[in-house]
Amino acid sequence: MKETIFEKKCVDIWISDHSVGADKIVNRLKEYGRFRNVTFISSREVVYSKKTSDKVKNLFYYGFGHNYSSDLPDYDEVIFHGLSVFSCGLYFYLNKRNVNTKWSSYEEGILSYDTDLPGGKSVKMLDAVFSIMGKKKIRNAIEQYYCVFPELKRRSNKSNTWEIVKIPDFNYNNGRIRDILALVFDFADMDIKQKYIFFTSSSDWDGRPYGEKEMVLKIADIVGSENLIIKKHPRDKNEYSLKNITTMNSDGVPWEIFQLCSDVAGKVLITVDSGSFLSVSAIKESNAKGVFIFPMVQDKRAKYECFVRRDKNIRDILDHLHAMRKCQDILILSELESLKTI
């Protein structure tokens, strides 16, 4: 967005420690030099605090913007994805200063289009407090939503009043863009020999297991472990090397960066429900094939409402992309044996 919509605008960017290696990315963004200020936010410990006393303290300290200093700029627009005590606190603080700020949201990958401003219990509590105080809730202050495919957002969310703003198409084959992404994420091209790349999730470690590791081992038996490499989710602690399956050593580099900056022609990208390669394949032709395999564990996923919703969302989004003549080589498989013919 800084290279397109906000190319000539003065922009600050805040990055939280929810992402692996965020502190290093902050330093590289400073080196990139296109932002006025690049700020690192330590928010993970606050958002995921366990003790009730800490949650209450954080709710009122951060949720009402007491952590923001008086020299904070009067921003014309704040753009964010997802609600937390930090975004609510910034909203409350700038409103208290009578700053006429426009509040906007943006997509976080193509599978986020069916979700409007996710937020936890703390945000709901702040919403209630703001209502009692007679103040507009932050989610009701949103005016715009930035995304690559406005038609998909309008299709998923017909009831909101947001102005849908298209993020301009971009030439991701441009050498300069690859150089910027490689700089910011400290990316060096990897010569992957394996034909099949599996993207794991963190479901086993987030309390919603459905047998993903067992699926990986079955795939290794079908295609050969020597032909399979694993791109692990940052929170996935499963060990695959004991089964002679190679794990990609990417040091926290998102797959999206790899696919945008590398040649993945001829590869077969496999996942239960990750949207990583779908998001990139929708905006850049890569000559790779992709398969979702959630139908094969649908009975185990059915007890989790979030997975039922996600599986339906994947089907809907993929059908719509196919109708747009995009992602024609990305399919939903109902049996693993079909991998041998892809």
Task: Please annotate each region the language model reported.
Residues 276-342:
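Catalytic binding pocket for nucleotide-activated donors in carbohydrate/polymer assembly enzymes
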Residues 76-79, 102, 195-196, 267-270:
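Structural motif
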Residues 107-197:
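A nucleotide-sugar donor-handling region in carbohydrate enzymes
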Residues 176-186, 191-236:
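Conserved catalytic-core segment of nucleotide-activated headgroup transferases in glycan assembly
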Residues 22-34, 88-97, 117-124, 239-246, ...:
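Short, aromatic/basic amphipathic alpha-helical patches
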Residues 234-283:
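Donor nucleotide-activated moiety binding/catalytic core segment of transferases
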